[in-house]
């Protein structure tokens, strides 16, 4: 029987990130946070389904294709909010990508990673 791991909740994520920031600052290190680069949810779904995986079952589990994007955006927004709340410098990577007219060329075929041009 496969072992199931408990996924961290958003509260867990915030707590862990805050703890890391405190530990770094306590050691005299100035942390810098960055927002997450955007993903292309449709490309990611296509990538997941490329080897015969059931698109219907994946969408049944997700609810809709864009849920992947929204979930990742929530984490990015949380990082930005915590940076503001803790006075931690923030690099707005997501915003830089979203401002790009050539955004599709910056995201790889898997929908998650950047192309060489994106890096």
Model regions: which residues?
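Alpha-helical cap/lid subdomain in secreted, periplasmic
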Residues: 1-117
């Amino acid at each position: 029987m496969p072992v199931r791991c408990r996924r961290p909740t958003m509260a867990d994520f915030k707590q862990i990130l805050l703890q890391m920031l405190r530990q770094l600052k306590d050691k005299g290190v100035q942390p810098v946070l960055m927002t997450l680069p955007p993903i292309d949810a449709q490309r990611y779904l296509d990538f997941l389904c490329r080897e015969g995986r059931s698109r219907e079952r994946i969408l049944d589990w997700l609810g809709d294709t864009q849920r992947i994007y929204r979930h990742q955006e929530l984490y990015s927004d949380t990082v930005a909010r915590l940076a503001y709340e803790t006075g931690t410098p923030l690099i707005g990577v997501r915003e830089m990508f979203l401002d790009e007219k050539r955004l599709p060329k910056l995201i790889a075929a898997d929908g998650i990673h950047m192309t060489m041009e994106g890096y």
